[in-house]
């Protein structure tokens, strides 16, 4: 049976804007109040997704969230018509309105943690939506995320969906952005790496001092239990608190893995050598490549600015691996020089392909943020909602949909415009028909 690693990219929503909501994310803060282009953002994402499909990879799309989120605004006391609620929120609590208008669900690396059937006791593919409790604008996502995942992976013979973890900082969970999987082949049992920022039940344990550690050890352990993973196929690694304080808010900003390659910065983890030894022991006899990038070649600041590690490492049909990188990596001399050297080294990585995802990058999300990886066999791929998979017809359909519904420019002050709410709901209602999702949004119920 054939096995694949599919990428499910987040479709950028109609309210994509730069509100600077993500403390700890340098790009998000630096671009606060800039003018965004929802249309360009969506098209950049679709273009990248289509390019990966054209490379022969299984590529899907996940629908965006309903924004502005009137349901949340009503929960926190705003009343009246939709237009009245938007007007009141803009005047009385503009920060809360901005949080309820974020298009952050585009970064599907934070949508959920996924464990493939080859790793789980029951032989099913498991999904746990991330609770994202550290950031208000993301903490309102998990229920709809669960709805969208269940509408996408909708065959209970193959897919097991869990509720997100309890909404408390002890279980702060940021999903696949702090999780990677190493394996010889996608269909073989692998080693799942859970990277965390702090251990909340141990006050004396290391933790960052400037920026929050969004992922807890307790959350990672809970997800592993839910997914029925054996201890001999899981490794828990603490991210270096110093790099969190330098803007590395998720592990996928400082490390990425694919099959038998772990690509990481030398400052990424605590107790690196001991953890690499544990990974190697649990990985077994097969060859594994630890590709460590030294600070002398790429400083943390350059890694964060370029998103060198927020790249996708993918296996092409030829068996070679390629890095899917943002064009920002070409524009950083140190990073570009390193990548040109990397493809000449004795590793499976032999190509670097560059994509313009600047609308996402300016909000702090690179190619890896935009995708949720799902390793599947051919029967599981066949069981996926086929209307969520990328192909020529769907690419054309979704681009026409974006052209019809999305604005060319959006400012933060536009978020209170009742017309934007109407445009967004009209677009999403049509999208659920294109992707055959059913009624996944509050306004449809």
UniProtKB/Swiss-Prot annotation:
PANTHER family (UniProt xref): N-SUCCINYLARGININE DIHYDROLASE (PTHR30420:SF2)
> Which ranges form a coiled coil?
none
Source taxonomy:
Bacteria, Pseudomonadati, Pseudomonadota, Gammaproteobacteria, Alteromonadales
**Which keywords has UniProt assigned to this entry?**
Arginine metabolism, Hydrolase
Where do the annotations place substrate binding?
19-28, 110, 137-138, 214, 252, 363
**Name of the protein described by the UniProt record:** N-succinylarginine dihydrolase
Annotated catalysed reactions: N(2)-succinyl-L-arginine + 2 H2O + 2 H(+) = N(2)-succinyl-L-ornithine + 2 NH4(+) + CO2
Respond yes or no to whether keyword Hydrolase is given for this record: yes
Q: Corresponding gene?
A: astB
